[in-house]
């Protein structure tokens, strides 16, 4: 069972003050069946193109969280039901999107955490453009590959180190 993000914040106030632990801006909504998730970050930077998102989710997730910096675009969705199912089937703990998702009923049926800014019915482009395994700027914090992501109904936390057993 995952420790609630609020409890992690309370237990690590010194690391919050130093910046070793950061709280993302409270702009993300939970769309997946699993509201709480945690794992090391795998990162992507894309813009209105989810080709690399699919490529990453086709790989074994090994308990990681895919962090997608979609530039905050609200003009199309970067993750939908098919990609959430792919994430679930391949062992990803969660997907955190600085952008939109779609197929919200399908997302709610997938046993994977999905947090995003909003829902949008339009699909994205498929040009396979973007960068992977780089630091990404998410609302409220910069995230490096391998940093720990903790998400639940109360928010999203980023840590340089694992905060739980």
Curated annotation (Swiss-Prot):
Substrate binds at residues 80-83, 102. GO terms for biological process: regulation of RNA metabolic process. The keyword Repressor does not apply. It catalyses: 4-hydroxy-4-methyl-2-oxoglutarate = 2 pyruvate; oxaloacetate + H(+) = pyruvate + CO2. The keyword Isomerase does not apply. Its cofactor is a divalent metal cation. Belongs to the class II aldolase/RraA-like family. This is Putative 4-hydroxy-4-methyl-2-oxoglutarate aldolase. It comes from Ralstonia nicotianae (strain ATCC BAA-1114 / GMI1000) (Ralstonia solanacearum).
